[in-house]
Amino acid sequence: MFRTRALALAAVASTALALTACGSDSLSEGDASATPEASTSAPTVDEALVAKLPESIKSAGVIKIGTDATYQPNEFLDADGKTVIGMDVDLFDAVMAKFGVKTEWVPSAFDAIILGVQSGKYDVGVSSFTVNNERMAQATMVSYFKAGTQWVTQKGNPKAINPDDACGKTVAVQKGTVQADVDLPARQKACTDAGKPEINVLVDADQAKVTASVQSGKADAMLV
């Protein structure tokens, strides 16, 4: 399964969208490759894009964005505990600069973002969603990035986690994600059908806490 990050470009004119990311199974050592230096040049406003914006956003000069600010490195809080930073933040700030409006990032529970877009609390949702039929029925999504679902363990995989056979292991996952709602339940069923111990699933709404559970050893692995 793929978790696809979605970004509203032309679709921003609908004021009903949410963004995403997800994927296939893998478990591998991290790669500390060099990161290219980012450009600091300011994007030029595109009047054709500005014309596509709803009047309410154009007049305000600001677009309000709901995000789960616990998902490093895509969207998370800076050291001040207030400012939302990350890869998606930099990207969407640059996109909206082309529309000539500023961004207002509002931290939200992951499973409340789409509801917030539907209710008008947010103009846009930018976070780590999987694009699927259920969500496409609720919000406009435009894919721009694909990444595989990752199994993450402590360094060296000390519990010898095998994604294809995690029966009897403790696995942490964020609430409301496809990993929590689809992936792990399917794996759980495979375990019970085979007469093996169930996966002990730890669910938390805060991705930072999910990560901490692996770091502390409370969980053997996590899915992201």
PLM region descriptions:
Residues 1-10:
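Bacterial N-terminal signal peptides that target proteins for export
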Residues 101-102, 119-127, 170, 215-224:
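Alpha-to-beta junction loops
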Residues 91-92, 113-114, 207-213, 219:
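Short, hydrophobic alpha-helical packing/hinge segments within bilobed ligand-binding/sensory domains
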Residues 72, 84-97, 129, 148-206, ...:
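Bilobed "Venus flytrap"/periplasmic-binding protein-like clamshell domains
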